[in-house]
Amino acid sequence: GAGESAGNVKKYEGSAELATQLEAAGDAVAEYLNEALKTWEPPKFLWRTLYTLLLLGLVVKRVVWQRKLNMQQTLQQIARVGPDTLGVAMLTSSFVGMVFTIQFCKEFSKVGLTRVIGGLLGLAFTRELTPVICAIVLAGRVGSAIAAELGTMQVSEQVDQLRTLGSDPVDYLVAPRVVACAVSLPILSLVSFSIGMAASILLADLRYGISPNAIIDSAAKYLESGDIGIMSFKALAFGAVIATISCGWGQTTTGGAKGVGESTTASVVISLVAIFVVDFFISLTWFQR
């Protein structure tokens, strides 16, 4: 009995010692985490993304719900977006269309299916190529300029001066640019689609001897009004996303001239990624109905 009691006492003492050690370890971990949280800052990308989402919500609130928009600034931005983007978008669409024409004509001529080339070109242009190409051009030409402009205003405290004068930066700087890009990109896409199809028709006729009427008839047979609609909707969404990201990254710029350059580059990269992500979800929703 005495041996058993001694064993139980030793077990109890061992358990108490283990509990004390675990408690001390827990206190040390808690203290470490507490100190780490005091000095932890969220990643710059995270809070920039949250700020950009907030900007998008504010723009929707101002424009859609409150019907509040600075028309003078918006028209100025539309006049800026068109010339900056149209020429490059048309040229890019032309060559992309001709590249696809070469592939389609070469492969489908082997199996006697030249009658479907026009339809395939039309579907490829309306559903994917035209809105994505124009969005990429917009991100590189206009989005970068917006980020650089607003970034410069931010680091030079011009945005703070606007607030001091009683002007809301969202109403004066952000909303006009978002609306301008969202309105302009569908128009640019329609023009680029026409130019791309024209270049494809010309190449098919001159290089492969396929009649322009055959291409046009095939495109008219396969294309529906919904295809033009999805092209316009994608372009509108891409324009709004690009402008919002560019404004968000511009208005969160820090670090002087170096920060402006970094924000400009980052805004273009994030915009390009966002284009393809948004494109995927729109296509998944639209074409799975």
Segments the model singles out, each with a brief description of its role:
Residues 25-74, 249-254:
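Short, membrane-interfacial amphipathic segments enriched in basic
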Residues 1-3:
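N-terminal mitochondrial targeting presequence
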Residues 260, 266-283:
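Final/C-terminal transmembrane alpha-helix of multipass membrane proteins
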Residues 150-175, 257-260:
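Short cytoplasmic-facing helical segments at TM-TM junctions of multi-pass membrane proteins
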Residues 103-126, 194-236, 240, 244-266, ...:
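Membrane-interfacial helix-loop-helix connectors in multipass membrane proteins
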Residues 117-160, 245:
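Hydrophobic alpha-helical transmembrane segments of multi-pass membrane transport proteins
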Residues 82, 86, 90, 129, ...:
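Selective transmembrane-helix segments that form parts of the transport pathway or gating/packing helices
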Residues 69, 73, 77-133, 137:
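Active-site cofactor/substrate anionic-group-binding motifs, chiefly glycine-
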